Amino acid sequence: KQQGQRNFLKLAKERGVNKFLAFLNSPPVYYTQNGLATNTGRGGTANLKPDCYEKYARFLADVVQGVEQHDGIKFNYICPFNEPDGHWNWVGPKQEGCPATNREIARTVRLLSKEFVDRNMDTQIMINESSDYRCMFRTHETDWQRGYQIQAFFCPDSVDTYLGDTPNVPRLMLGHSYWTTTPLSELRNIRCQLRDTLDKHQVGFWQTETCIMGNDEEIGGGNGFDHTMKTALYVARIIHHDIVYAKAESWQWWRAKIGR
């Protein structure tokens, strides 16, 4: 299964990559409520059947073990939900989406943690691959159930969603740089607010996805290969602000080429 993706993993390993992160754009369609990998026709809750949470956790553990056994590649990290707070991911059938509330994420992570412990697996479970930094410390175009993520997962007072003492879950939040790159004043301000909240709860931070998209109006959007200095300086500015002000300990690019 997924031979193309697995071939890319092998090619990356052959070229010296030694850390691998897996993430989910959707649970398998046979576990989803609408039978699709998109969230079409639904709101901002997990597209996962109520009786399939345990099955989903077992599936993820099986995949991590299977890839290591068959391909010799160990997933060091796995994130069960990708951009669960995204305001785009229930609008229509355009894109795979993985919306979920903080409670649904916490339930899944606890089950996956137990599965890993039972199998003596040390793969780290990452949260939350947020689509927007603002959802990590407040709300933005969503309600409280999918916002305030740092507080929800790492403040002990959040008894329903606290994951700070969960095995295989590091004190680390993952987020994507999209939507917060302009204007310049907000580029810095949002990252300073993010860092203040992370520091308050003693949580680290990785920036795990960004690229030039059509909404990057300052440089005219991103299509094809763009080798211009204007775009290079724009990307450098994002990297600088993510590392200096948000103190990202890891910074990851998404797509090498953008096309329509």
Where would I find each of the regions flagged by the language model?
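Extracytoplasmic/secreted cell-surface and envelope-processing proteins
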Residues: Y30-T32, H87-W90, R134-F137, T181-N189, ...
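Aromatic/acidic polysaccharide-binding cleft in carbohydrate-active enzymes
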Residues: G204-R260
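Structural recognition of alpha->loop->beta junctions
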Residues: G72-F75, F153-M173, T231-S250
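A general structural signal for short secondary-structure junctions and capping/turn motifs
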Residues: K10-E14, D196-L198, H240-Y245
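Glycoside hydrolase catalytic-domain groove-lining segments
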Residues: N7, K114, D118, D122-I125, ...
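Structural recognition of the beta-strand scaffold that forms the well-ordered cores
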Residues: K19-L24, N76-P80, Q124-I127, R171-G175, ...
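Substrate-binding cleft and catalytic face of glycoside hydrolase catalytic domains
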Residues: K1-N168
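Catalytic metal-binding/acid-base residues of hydrolase active sites
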Residues: P84-D85, S131, L174, Y178-W179, ...
